Each structure stands twice: as C-alpha cells, then as structure tokens.
C-alpha cells in the first residue's frame, strides 16, 4: 500500500492540518499518565515546524459523546506537547467556527496550534460532510498520522480527504504500513505468529488471514480452552466459548489443509479464582482439574514457544498468554516478550500488534527491544485481518 507521505510534499508557508492520536490517559487531576502517543507524533510534527509549515493539530480524547465536556479537553495534551517541543502551542477553544478560523489564519511559519476535541461534535463520528468540509477549510495540506483511528471512517480521518487537494500519511502511519505490510506481504521465513487473548471470536478473521501467510501459529490466552474442548479435553472451569466449538474444529482442520503448524499449550497454570492470592499450580492440558481455571501457559509450553520464536525470522505477536495484570499469571506473557527481544537480537523482525500486547511488552520493559510496537489496537487487528482501513485508503497514492 504505497501512499504519499510528508516527505513527498513541500510544506513551507502552508497551513498543514494534521490528525494525530492524542487520546492519552489522564488521572483524576487531569495529568497525563502516559504520553507515548504524543511522543510518537513528534517526528511528523517536527518535520512541519522545521520546514516552516503552519501546523494545526486535531485529535479526539475519550468518549465525550458529541457534547462539550471540559473533562475531555485536549488542553493537557497541548501543554505536554509544548513542553516536549520547547515552544508555545496555542490551544483553540473549539475545532470549528469563525474564532478558530481567525486563529488559524494568524499562524506564522513554524507555529503550532491544537484544536479542541473533535468528538465534542457528534458530526465527527457520523462522518458528516459539512463538518468535514469545515475542518478541511482550515488547511491546505492534510496529514493523517493517527493510526489508532485509521479503521474508522470519521470526518477527520476519511470525510476530510474529499475536500483537500493534498492528503498524505505522517511518519507514524508510514512506519505502521511498512512493518505490518511487510509482515503480511513480504515476510522473511520462518514466519511465526503468536495469538493470545480471551476469545477466539475476536481473532477468527486474523487467524484465517494469517493461515495464508505464516508457517506456525502459537496460541495462548483463554481462547486455547475452546480449542481443547473441541478436541475433547477436560477444561475444568476455564473460560470456553461453547458456541465457537464447531469453529475451533474447523480452524484446526484449516490449519492442517494449509500446512500451517497450529501449536497449542501442553501445560497451563491453574487456580480456583482469578486473584493475586489464589493458590495456583501447573497442570498438563490432558488433566485439568474440575473447578480450576487455566490462567496462563505453563513452563513446558513457555520452553516450546520460546524455541519456536527463536527459530523464526519474522514474528508477529497479538494478545497476551494469560491474565498478565496479575503477577502470578504473567510469566507466560513476559517469557514471550523476552523471547521476542532475544529473537530481535538474533536478527529477526518482531512486530507487536497493538492493544494488550503493547501494554504487556511495555510492562515487561522491553518495548525498545523489538522491531516495532504498533500504536493501534483495533486498527492493527483489522489490518492483520486483511481489511482496508478507510483512513489510509483515503490518502493520496
């Protein structure tokens, strides 16, 4: 998917309207608890400033449901950006309207302003053409650098592109397309995918799409128990999607047909309840006790999975191996994270597909030891399912 990027156009003296993803977590005093999304947008932002463009940033934050709500103001993000850049960032009091337009027109080369939360207007998520046109009127160039919302056809990601002559990808989106695209279309082999998470239903399309691409799939997380039940194994009290058992059987058959090795755990860590002080033990998957729930992959599985990962040239990871939020059920997830870091050291391309896996690798302190951590949860998932992302499809080729 070749899209024009910031590097392909001249920015000097131009009003550049950039969609970023500043949907950052805030504490009750409205302090930002994690600024990685703002930091991630810095290369694109700096490029516009250095080239003398006039930068207008827009984003959403949280779910204000189409109403103005000061708790969801982007002011803390503008303040943090100003600190990171070491220069002022003007904060607008809305994202459309005459007053905002006057501020936009007053911008000088190399200056930056931040529009207020797009989702204070219901028209944003409705992809309303008039709202999109009004946003577009503020800029001469549109840049989308918000991969996290690229799977949504909203006014600021899709609608706006109909009303600007130039619509290009920012560096963050370019990097996402490069790594996720390479993984899907041009991977060095062996190519191993690790899929975790609670439910098969959330990962069916990814599994089916990856069967045409990968050599091996390692499965973890609670979704393994639906596979085990499909194979007639005891699952105790583990989470099972009973309405997906037929599907699990067909996925196992499909993997066989396509010559993909679908590897399931051989042992699991079980406990009677999901709590930090529950007594846990390791059991083979052939004899999971009644009343016990599987909450992580066991040591023998960790060893097998680590070996598979270390033998790979390309690794894609999406979804944790267990309830990693609780330390005693986090060993499997952290061991996979460590194996990915070791594989990267050995020259493999390692890609973390956003969402919980990104949180897990950050918790393990290994985010900078892998090739690429995707910034989009739902967007990475849809990309890995082979779906077209409207926010990217709409950009200039």
Swiss-Prot record:
It comes from Chlorobaculum parvum (strain DSM 263 / NCIMB 8327) (Chlorobium vibrioforme subsp. thiosulfatophilum). Its EC number is 2.7.2.3. It is found in: Cytoplasm. Substrate binds at residues 21-23, 37, 60-63, 119, 152. Pathway: Carbohydrate degradation; glycolysis; pyruvate from D-glyceraldehyde 3-phosphate: step 2/5. The gene is pgk. Belongs to the phosphoglycerate kinase family. The keyword Transferase applies. One of its GO terms (cellular component) is cytosol. Gene3D superfamilies: Phosphoglycerate kinase, N-terminal domain. HAMAP family: Phosphoglyc_kinase (MF_00145). One of its GO terms (molecular function) is ATP binding. Monomer. This is Phosphoglycerate kinase. Keywords: ATP-binding, Cytoplasm, Glycolysis, Kinase, Nucleotide-binding, Transferase.
């Amino acid at each position: 998917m070749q899209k024009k990027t910031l590097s392909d156009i001249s920015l000097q003296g131009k009003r550049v309207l950039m969609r970023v993803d500043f949907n950052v977590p805030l504490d009750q005093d409205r302090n930002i608890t994690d600024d990685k999304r703002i930091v991630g947008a810095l290369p694109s932002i700096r490029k516009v400033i250095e080239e003398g463009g006039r930068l207008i940033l827009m984003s959403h934050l949280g779910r204000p449901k189409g109403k103005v709500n000061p708790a969801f103001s982007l002011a803390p993000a503008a303040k943090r950006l100003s600190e990171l850049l070491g220069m002022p960032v003007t904060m607008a009091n809305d994202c459309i309207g005459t007053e905002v337009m006057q501020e936009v027109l007053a911008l000088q080369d190399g200056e930056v302003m931040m529009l207020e939360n797009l989702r204070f207007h219901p028209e944003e998520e409705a992809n309303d053409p008039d709202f999109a046109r009004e946003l577009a009127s503020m800029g001469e160039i549109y840049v989308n650098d918000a991969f996290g919302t690229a799977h949504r056809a909203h006014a600021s990601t899709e609608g706006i592109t109909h009303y600007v002559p130039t619509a290009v990808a920012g560096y963050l989106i370019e990097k996402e397309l490069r790594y996720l695209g390479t993984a899907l279309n041009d991977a060095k082999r062996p190519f191993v995918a690790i899929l975790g998470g609670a439910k098969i239903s959330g990962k069916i399309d990814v599994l089916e799409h990856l069967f045409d691409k990968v050599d091996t799939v390692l499965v973890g997380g609670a979704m393994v128990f639906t596979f085990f039940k499909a194979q007639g194994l005891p699952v105790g009290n583990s989470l099972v999607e009973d309405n997906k058992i037929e599907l699990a059987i067909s996925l196992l058959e499909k993997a066989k047909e396509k010559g993909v090795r679908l590897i399931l755990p051989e042992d699991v860590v079980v406990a009677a309840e999901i709590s930090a002080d529950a007594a846990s033990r390791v059991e083979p998957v052939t004899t999971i006790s009644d009343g016990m729930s599987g909450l992580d992959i066991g040591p023998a599985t960790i060893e097998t999975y680590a070996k598979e990962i270390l033998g790979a040239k390309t690794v894609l990871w999406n979804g944790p191996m267990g309830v990693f939020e609780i330390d005693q059920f986090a060993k499997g997830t952290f061991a996979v994270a460590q194996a990915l870091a070791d594989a990267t050291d050995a020259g493999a391309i390692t890609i973390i597909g956003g969402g919980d896996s990104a949180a897990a690798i950050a918790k393990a302190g290994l985010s900078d030891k892998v090739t690429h951590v995707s910034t989009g949860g739902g967007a990475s998932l849809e990309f890995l399912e082979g779906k077209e992302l409207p926010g990217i499809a709409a950009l200039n080729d």
